[in-house]
Amino acid sequence: MKKYILSLDQGTTSSRAILFNKEGKIVHSAQKEFTQHFPKPGWVEHNAQEIWGSILAVIATCLSEADVKPEQIAGIGITNQRETAVVWDKTTGKPIYNAIVWQSRQTVEICDELKEKGYSEMVREKTGLLIDAYFSGTKVKWILDNVEGAREKAENGELLFGTIDTWLVWKLSGGKAHITDYSNASRTLMFNIHDLQWDDELLDMLTVPKSMLPEVRQSSEIYGETIDYHFFGQNVPIAGVAGDQQAALFGQACFGEGMAKNTYGTGCFMLMNTGEKAVASEHGLLTTIAWGLDGKVNYALEGSIFVAGSAIQWLRDGLRMFKDASESEVYASRVESTEGVYIVPAFVGLGTPYWDSEVRGAMFGVTRGTTKEHFIRATLESLAYQTKDVLCAMEADSGIELNTLRVDGGAVKNNFLMKFQSDILDVPVERPVINETTALGAAYLAGLAVGYWKNQDEIKAQWHMDKRFEPTMEAETSEELYAGWKKAIEATKAFK
C-alpha cells in the first residue's frame, strides 16, 4: 500500500526528509546540517557530494525512525535552495568544483562586465531577472573560466550543469534523468520565461555550451525513478520539483491570481501569483515562473528582503540582548512603541525595491530614554516595513490589491511581529497550521503527478489556518510610522 509522499527539502544550511500522509500532515522528519565553505570574503560554496550524502542520510533516518518501508512511498518531491550551481563530469559523476551558492558574490566582476556591455535590458526582457551574482548563469561561466580544462570538456559535451534539484534527481536516478523544472530554470539567467526554453542569445552572452544544460520539465510529472541501490531496492517515482520559494507558494495553496505568501527565514521572500501572464516589473521586483502544471505555466512576482530572521539572530548573538529568539516577542511587547527609533538592518545591502548592495545598516531616533525593549521592537518592526516596501511594489506592478497575506517560516511564531505586520499593511495576515510549506509544496506536486491527490481543489481543502491577525491600527498612525521608515531608508542610502 502506497501510504506516503516523501519530500526532500535541500536548503542552504541543512537537508531534510519529511514524510507526508494523505491529509497533508507530517508523519516524520529528519534533518542534517552540512559544511559551509568560505574560500574568500563574500564567497560561499558547498560540497555537492556532501549535500548528496546528507540527502541519503536523512532519507534513511526518516524512514527507519518512522518505521516506514520504502515500498510504502508513492512518490518523491524535491525542493531546493535556488540558483546554487553545480557542474559535474558526465562519466564519473563527480563535481569539478564546489557548488557555488546563491549568496556567493564571487561573480560580481562578471556581472559588472555584462552590464557595461549593455546586456541588462535584454536579460530583463527574456528572464525577468537582473544581472546579478545571485543567479546561476554567471556561476557556471565562472567555473568554466576558472577550473583548469573545464571549458574544453564542456565544449566536448563531457560536463553537465544543474541547480541542486537537477543534481539530486540525477544522483537518485543513477544518472538516467538530467532534468530541472520551470521554476528552477527561471532562476538561471539562461532561460527565456516567455518561450519556455534555454535561450541561445543568453548562452552566447555567458559562453555556456547548451549541451551542459538539463531538460526543462513541468514541476509535477514523473521524471524518472530512484535506482534501486539508492533507495533500498525500490524504484520510486521522482515526480515533483520546485525551487523553495515557489514550492512554499504552492504549499500555501496560493493557486489564484493575486494570492501571495511571505516566507520569514534568514531573509524574506514574498511571491504573488500573477496567473498565466508574466508581469514585467517597473518597481524592482523579479518576474519568475511559479510552476508548470497540467501543460500550463503560472508566473509570479517576487520580492527579496536580504535580512529578516538574521536581524533577530544579530540581536541574540551579536548584541547578546537575549538568549532565545522567542524572547524578542516578550521584550518588544513591553513597550507601547519604539518612541521614534528606526533600525534599518541593511547588513548586506538592501534588496527589493532598492537593490543597493553598497548601503549598510543604520539606526535613527535614539535618545537617552531608548531602552533595550525599544531597540528590539524597532528591529522586529523593520521586518514588517521591508515587507510593506515589497507589497507596495507588487500592487503597483500587478494592479492587484492584496486582500490577505499568507505567511510561513521561522519568525511567524512571533505574534507581536505578525500583528504589527497586519497593522502596517492594513491587510489580514494568515498563519497556517503546517508551517513546513516548502516541503509540503514539493510533496503536493509529486502527489498530484502520481495520483496520490486528485487535484488542486483537494489540496486547497487541506490548508488550515492556525491564526488570523487583523489590522486594528488607525490608518493615520500606520501611515505616519511608514513615512518615518521611508525617511530612515533615504538617510541610510545617503550614508556610504
UniProtKB/Swiss-Prot annotation:
It comes from Bacillus mycoides (strain KBAB4). The phosphoenolpyruvate-dependent sugar phosphotransferase system (PTS), including enzyme I, and histidine-containing protein (HPr) are required for the phosphorylation, which leads to the activation of the enzyme. Belongs to the FGGY kinase family. Gene3D superfamilies: 3.30.420.40. It comes from the Bacteria. Its EC number is 2.7.1.30. The modification Phosphohistidine is found at residue 230. This is Glycerol kinase. InterPro entries: ATPase_NBD, Carb_kinase_FGGY, Carb_kinase_FGGY_CS, FGGY_C, FGGY_N, Glycerol_kin. Pathway: Polyol metabolism; glycerol degradation via glycerol kinase pathway; sn-glycerol 3-phosphate from glycerol: step 1/1. NCBIfam families: glycerol_kin, PRK00047.1.
